[in-house]
Amino acid sequence: MQTETRSHPRFNHVALTVPGDLLDARGRDEILRFHGEVFGWTEMPTLTRDRELLVLRAWSHEQFVFLAASDSPLRGDGSEHFGLSVATRGELDAMWERAEKLRGADPRVELTERKTDDFKVLQLHSFYVRFLLPIRIEVQCYEWAPGFDDQRMR
């Protein structure tokens, strides 16, 4: 008899509306260059439609950022974001350094300083970055104290 394995649902994509002009050849190239260099994302080229659609593959075909053109695109006030979790502080620092290097070449890159929030059992390292998209991306690394982890906190 086969036992059923249960897993939690997980987020698999973020969909955002953007101005159609951002999805022209130049805009797509800029979006792909930045997000590719900082996060390692790639284009799903079979889905790309000029001035209509760009899908950024985020490490697997089941994780992606879906950018669709709209006459009324999303406009954030600065607090809207989605989060990425990395396994190590080194990964977080490397992403921040790549974003910082690109900010030096392009002032449109918005990047916060890295910070650490101390929750005693958890050191939460993070930064925010945004380039051309209507919302920011928060990169986080959870550094648990000995004897603690995300499972123990349930």
Q: What do these predicted regions represent?
A:
Residues 44, 48-87, 91, 152-154:
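A short, hydrophobic/aromatic-rich structural module that often spans a beta strand
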Residues 20-22, 62, 88-90, 135, ...:
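Residues that cap or initiate secondary-structure elements
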Residues 16-63:
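Core segments of cupin and vicinal oxygen chelate
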Residues 37-40, 97-101:
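Short, intrinsically disordered, mixed-charge
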Residues 3-13, 21, 54-57, 69:
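Conserved N-terminal glycine/acidic-rich loop preference
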Residues 1-24, 74-100, 102-154:
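Vicinal oxygen chelate
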